[in-house]
Each structure stands twice: as structure tokens, then as C-alpha cells.
Amino acid sequence: MLGGKKTGGMNVYVRDLSRALEAVGVAVDVFTRSQDDCAPRVVHDLGPLARVMHIPAGPERPMAVGDTEPYLGEFVANVLDFAEREGVRYDILHSHYWLSGLAAEALAAGWGGTPIVHMFHTLGAMKNQIARDASERAPQSRLEGERRVARIADRLVAPTPAEEVQLVELYGADARKIVVVPPGVDLAHFNPIHQLQAKQMIGIPPNRKNILFAGRIEPLKGIDTLLEAIALLKERQVTDLSDTCVTIIGGNPWAETLDEELERLQRMRLDLGLDDLVAFAGARDQQILPYYYAAAEMVVMPSHYESFGMVALEAMAMGTPVIASEVGGLAYVVRDGYNGFLVPRRNAEALALRIADLLGDHRLRQQLSANAMNYARDYSWARIAQQILGVYQAVAAPSPVLS
């Protein structure tokens, strides 16, 4: 599911990288905390050489990421037991997110110094720079954990040169250990579909223009800026919105108890008089997501911070232009005026103008669409996996078995 409470780009990254590595003969074991005691402990759905292991650690139910830290020791012990029972030896530990980096450190010690490759995906120090209040700030334990992982990892994978600089300046990371490798996109899955076919598939009238947001419902995604921009367009009548809808993919708008941010955004929609324009569609399965991208005239990513922004690549692969905040990885993925537009973050005025530009100019949308598809081809997972494999080979023996 995209836009679910505990899902996002990192899960997609791990899944697709594992499949791409498996496709070139690398054996991959993915260890994750079990969230369901009825689920199989070992799942073989990433390919013949790839497995997903659900490891008990704490209550076997979904938990907020921050609440899993006390169970890190139990997780490590159970992974060590599993590997010993299976008689498996790993040549590389590739950890994702800071807690997994700490787990990798303990596992490496248990296995006699297995090299660690780490990718943070998001940085607590960067989130804190744009946090509006204490509730949005990363805790001190995370910042200290990230500094430790930056120090002990043999290689750090940064998705952009911007994060490479942030790792050095904010965490004191050794620049010689950092390699820049962007995420990829599944070009077979995100393969262009005719827009009319896509609209029919998801129930959007053929003559209706669609503005799409896809992602988790959380403050740093800047969805409130999108709502403010649409309200400006409606108020000023800069462009005709009578044939336009805004679809927000993410969260669960039908839950008995709404997520705090989702509740705030729904109130905001009503206060701004946008209930006839904006629809909260909830999280959507990855299988149907390409149709939403293809049905949209544009994808809007008004984020306050993005380490990379895989949604932008997925949209471009479908031929959909992206309007994004000029922050983090989005500033590298979106080429202003080529495959989309960049706007200052938290600037509803600038965002409204760019939305109006795309809504009102079919020829411009076509040009950006063609450019976006060409651009996305450079990010195939086959190509990215080769770059990651090069990182592994630099720190370990040939023919690695990965965890």
C-alpha cells in the first residue's frame, strides 16, 4: 500500500532493490520485525534467491517506529539464532533507517565483523530543521543513534549529493565512506498507460483534469500548502476549476479515529470551501497506483523535506509531470521546466501559479510528460542494482550473500 501509516518509499526501496539483486544472482535475506503472529516466518515472494524473514521482537502487532527501540536486543538475538539454525553466513549487512543500523552493528559483532552498508532514508537532523513544534522533532535518541551509525558503517549510501553534504556537516561522517546512489524505479510496473484508459479504470470522468498527491499523511509532506494553493486558484479564478479534481492518496479517511494530521487536513478542506474539489482517497495498493499517476495531469509534492522522493520518479515513469518543493532529493529529481516545476517550500502562491500553468496549457503538459518518461529511464532498478553491487564488492568478497 502507498500512503499507509507505516509504509512508504523505504519499504518499496528494500523490496525492489532485493528483487533486482536477486535477478543478477545475489542471494538476499530481508529481516524485519514480525507484526503478525499468524504470518509465515519465512516468505519467498521476492524471487528464488530472496527471502523475507519475520522475526519476533516485542508484541507481534504494528507499532510506531519509535516504540520498537526497546526490542532491538531481542530482534538481534533472534536473527543470530535464525542464522545459526540455518547455517547461513552473510558477507554484507545492508541496513536501512537508523534503528536497523544499530541492529546491524550488533549483528556484525556477533558474526565476527561483517561489513555494514547503511542507508538512512531520512535524517532526524533534517526533520528537526523544518519541525514546527516539539511533536514533529526527532528525539535525541534518534540523533545519537544516527551519529553512531554514520561512524561505524563501512559505507554510507546517500541518494543525492545534498544528503552526502548533510551526513558530513550534520553528523561528522567520513566523506570517504559515502557513495551517492539514487533509488530506482520499476519501469515494468510503472509503464505508461493511455490517460483515458487510466481514468476509466479509477472512475474519473474523461473530461476531468486531476491533480494528484500520493504519500503518507504527515506534516512534513506539506499537503496543507497544496490545499492553500487550490483555495487561491478558486478564490482568484486564475484558471477554470469546474472540470478539475484533487485526489489525495494516503492514510485512512474512513477510520473510526482519524489520524491527527488527516483530521486537521479534512477540517482545513471544509474551512477553505474545497469539499467539492478535494477528495481523500486513502492508501492505494501498488498494483493500482500506476493508473492514478497516468490519470493525473500532474503530481504535486509540496514536501518540506524529502531525502529523495520516489513518488516523483514513479510519476515521471508514467509520463506525469511533477510540481515539487525545491528541497532535498526533489531538487535533484525534478528538473525545473524540463520534467516538471520546482517551487519554494511552504509557498502556496508559487505552487498555485505552477498548477495553473499546467492546467491551462495542454502542449506544455505533453512536452513535460515526454521529458519525464525519458528522464525516468535512467533510473531502472537493473542499473541502480549494479551500482549498489559495486558498493558491496568494494567492502566484501565476491559473490556476496546479503542481509
Give the ranges of each region predicted by the language model:
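Aromatic "clamp/platform" in nucleotide-sugar-dependent glycosyltransferases that forms part
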Residues: H304
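Short hydrophobic beta-strand element within catalytic cores of glycosyltransferases
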Residues: A312, P321-A324, V334
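A conserved catalytic-core segment of Leloir-type glycosyltransferases
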Residues: T7, V12, A20-Y90
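A short helix/loop element that forms part of the nucleotide-sugar donor recognition site in Leloir-type
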Residues: N191-I204
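A short, well-ordered alpha-helix in the C-terminal region of glycosyltransferases
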Residues: A350, D357, L364-D378, A394
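Conserved acidic donor-binding segment of nucleotide-sugar-dependent glycosyltransferases
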Residues: D336-G337, F341-A348, D357-H362
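Nucleotide-activated donor-binding/catalytic signature segment of Leloir-type glycosyltransferases, i.e.
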Residues: D259-R284
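Short alpha-helical donor nucleotide-sugar binding micro-motif in glycosyltransferases
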Residues: A283, Y291-A296
